[in-house]
Structures are given as C-alpha cells and as structure tokens.
Swiss-Prot record:
Reactions catalysed according to its record: RX + glutathione = an S-substituted glutathione + a halide anion + H(+)
Example GO BP: glutathione metabolic process
GO molecular function list: glutathione transferase activity
Domain GST C-terminal: 90-214
Family affiliation: Belongs to the GST superfamily. HSP26 family.
Protein name as annotated: Probable glutathione S-transferase
Pfam families in the cross-refs: GST_C, GST_N
Domain GST N-terminal: 4-83
InterPro entries from the UniProt entry: Glutathione-S-Trfase_C-like, Glutathione-S-Trfase_C_sf, Glutathione_S-Trfase_N, GST_C, GST_C_Tau, Omega/Tau-like, Thioredoxin-like_sf
C-alpha cells in the first residue's frame, strides 16, 4: 500500500488517542501526528468529526475514522497482512475481546474521572467502583501474560493507555493500585516493556501535572 496518507488528530494525554498510537506502532504504519488544542479545535478536526468534534480521529487517504476502538479495528482490517494480528482469528475470541474493550469504555473512564473531579463520599464511592472494576479485569486476565493469551493485542491496547493516568488517580483517590490489584500492575509493567507502548504513553508525573491544572480550572484546588 504505497503512497498512503495516514494522519492522526490527537491530544497527548488522551488514553483513547494512545490506543491508535500503539496500534499504528505495532503495525509499523507511518503517519503524521497532529496535536489538537481542544480549547480551539482545528477546522480539520471539525471537518473530519462533525458529529462529536472529538479526538482521536484517524484520517486514511482523506477519509476519517472516528471513535478509538473502531479505529483500532480499522487498522487491523486494512493492514491485516502486517504482523502482529491485533484481534484473534477465532470469532468467539474476537467477540470476547470486543466485550472487554466495551466494558473498559463503559466503566473505567467514568470511575477514573470521578477520582479527580469529586470529593468526600462521592470520591470514596468512585474509588470503590474503580478498584472493583480493576479486579474484574484482573479476573479476565487470569494467569495469562496478556488478555488475549501469549500475545499483546486488542484488549491490552484498549486498556493500557489508562495506566498513564494511574499516578493521578492514586494521588487524588489516596490509594495504591499495586496494593489493591498487583496482577493488574504486573500486566501494565509487562505492556510498558513494549516499544510501541513505551513510546505512545506520556510519563505519569506529566499527566498528574496536567490533571492538577484541570482541577484548578474546575475550582477543585
């Protein structure tokens, strides 16, 4: 597929954008990265995602693919001949991978956000929900090195971006992920050893500083 144009509209702390960075890196797809200012969204972003007006947006030969999980599947389908395979070949296993990616999107983001945007009883409830969610994911991981088994893949890509936010979650939620969910942290550290992940995720202290600025804007500091 020569002369392809691949552009990623993204914002550096976005765990959703990190999914596409990792997937593109795993497939060794060259692309142009365009950092968005979400307070002053570019005409290109508004043109390419007129419905949600959100990042990330993958633009392939002028055509936009929105929503990060959909875009990761698109990357797998378009470049299926490039190793590694991001989704399992077995239909049942693919369905299970999609189930867990959906679970992550429906549960983890909101619980994590509440850890740094709330206080008191609401924050304590969010912490309980967040840790319970991680324990459910630990159960799905089991004793496997990755969610799909021996190989890094779809569910790992869907989840690992959140890890860059964990220092912020722990700081404001006042808990230790390693103490509560050691198997999850071991999995995350295993993922971080992959070049595609290490280069796609920002440093946790940098994300913490970003969250502190947001908290000040929201009047939480």
């Amino acid at each position: 597929m020569a002369n392809e144009e691949v552009i990623l509209l993204d914002f550096w702390p976005s765990m959703f954008g990190m999914r596409l960075r990792i997937a593109l890196a795993e497939k060794e797809i060259k692309y142009e990265y365009k950092e968005e200012d979400l307070r002053n969204k570019s005409p290109l972003l508004l043109q390419m995602n007129p419905i949600h007006k959100k990042i990330p947006v993958l633009i392939h030969n002028g055509k936009p693919i929105c929503e990060s999980i959909i875009a990761v599947e698109y990357i797998e389908e378009v470049w299926k001949d490039k190793a590694p395979n991001l989704l399992p070949s077995d239909p049942y296993d693919r369905a299970q991978a999609r189930f867990w990616a959906d679970y992550i999107d429906k549960k983890l983001y909101d619980f994590g956000r509440k850890l740094w945007t709330t206080k008191g009883e609401e924050q304590e409830a969010a912490k309980k929900d967040f840790i319970e969610c991680l324990k459910v994911l630990e159960g799905a991981l089991g004793d496997k090195p990755y969610f799909g088994g021996e190989s890094f893949g779809f569910v790992d890509i869907a989840l690992i971006g959140y890890y860059s936010w964990f220092y912020a979650y722990e700081t404001f939620g006042n808990f230790s992920t390693e103490a509560e969910c050691p198997k999850f942290v071991a999995w995350a550290k295993r993922c971080m050893q992959r070049e595609s992940v290490a280069k796609s995720l920002p440093d946790q202290p940098k994300v913490l500083e970003f969250v502190k600025v947001l908290r000040q804007k929201f009047g939480l500091e």
